[in-house]
Design a protein with these regions (language model features):
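ABC family nucleotide-binding domain
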Residues: 15-17, 22-227
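ABC-family P-loop ATPase nucleotide-binding domain
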Residues: 1-25, 233-235
Length: 235
C-alpha cells in the first residue's frame, strides 16, 4: 500500500482503530526480542474483529498497543482520531476513559462494592450526576436487574462477567477490547457471555476487538486477524 493510501486510511472517519507499522521489542538475557513486527491494520466503527494466534504470538501485546496501555517501539496507532504515539500516559489515559471499554479473563471487580457500585465507578470518575441511573439501566440490559445490590462474592462467574461487561459499556465506548473474556467460564456460560457481547456490539455499534485462541468463537466475528510470531499472516 502506498504512503498516500495509508494516510488516507488513517484519516478515514469510518475507521475507529488503525495501526501502521506497529512494532514492539523488549530486552531479554538472550538479546532483543521482537514481540510484534510491522503490524498494520484498520478496524471500522461497529465491526467485530477477532485477533487469534498461538500462545506467544503477540495477541495481548497488540491489544495493549491498540488500546494505549503500552507504547510501541516503532510505528503508530490511532484510536478514535487520536494518534496514541504522540500522547504521554496521561493523554492516553484520557483517550481510554472517553473512547474505550475493557473486558478481561479476570473480572477485576472491586469486592467491597455491589454490582451497581462497580458499574458506577467510571461514571463517578467522570463526575456524571446520573451515574446510578445509568448503571442500573445497563445492568438491566445484561440481565442483572435483580442483582444490582449483590456483592461479587454473591454472584456466579457468569454474573460477575456480566457486571464487568456492564461496566465496560456504561460509558458507551467507541471500542470494546475483550481479552479472552470466556477464559474463566465453563463452555455454556461462555457462550451466553459471547451472545451478550455480540448482541451489544450490534445494538450499540460499539466496535468489538476480541483476543481469543478459540477459532469457533473467532469465526463469529466479522473478520479475523491472525498473528504468527508477531506478524499478521493470512487467516
Amino acid at each position: 500500500m502506498a504512503a498516500s493510501e495509508k494516510q488516507a486510511l488513517m484519516n478515514d472517519t469510518t475507521v475507529v482503530l488503525a495501526a501502521e507499522g506497529l512494532g514492539k521489542q523488549v530486552s531479554s538475557p538472550e538479546g532483543t526480542l521482537a514481540i510484534l513486527a510491522d503490524v498494520s491494520l484498520s478496524i471500522r466503527r461497529g465491526e467485530s474483529v477477532a485477533i487469534i494466534g498461538a500462545s506467544g504470538a503477540g495477541k495481548s501485546t497488540l491489544l495493549a498497543l491498540l488500546a494505549g496501555l503500552d507504547e510501541p517501539t516503532s510505528g503508530r496507532a490511532v484510536l478514535a482520531g487520536n494518534d496514541l504515539t504522540r500522547l504521554d500516559e496521561d493523554g492516553r489515559a484520557a483517550v481510554r476513559a472517553s473512547h474505550v471499554g475493557f473486558v478481561f479473563q479476570s473480572f477485576h471487580l472491586v469486592p467491597s462494592l455491589t454490582a451497581i457500585e462497580n458499574v458506577m465507578l467510571p461514571l463517578e470518575l467522570a463526575r456524571r450526576p446520573d451515574a446510578r441511573e445509568a448503571a442500573r439501566e445497563v445492568l438491566g440490559r445484561v440481565g442483572l436487574a435483580e442483582r444490582v445490590g449483590h456483592y461479587p462474592r454473591q454472584l456466579s462467574g457468569g454474573e460477575q462477567q456480566r457486571v464487568a461487561i456492564a461496566r465496560a459499556f456504561v460509558r458507551q465506548p467507541d471500542v470494546l477490547f475483550a481479552d479472552e473474556p470466556t477464559g474463566n467460564l465453563d463452555a455454556a456460560t461462555g457462550e451466553k457471555i459471547m451472545d451478550l457481547l455480540f448482541g451489544l456490539n450490534r445494538a450499540t455499534q460499539t466496535t468489538l476487538v476480541l483476543v481469543t485462541h478459540d477459532r469457533q468463537l473467532a469465526a463469529r466475528c466479522d473478520r479475523i486477524i491472525r498473528l504468527e510470531a508477531g506478524r499478521v499472516v493470512p487467516s
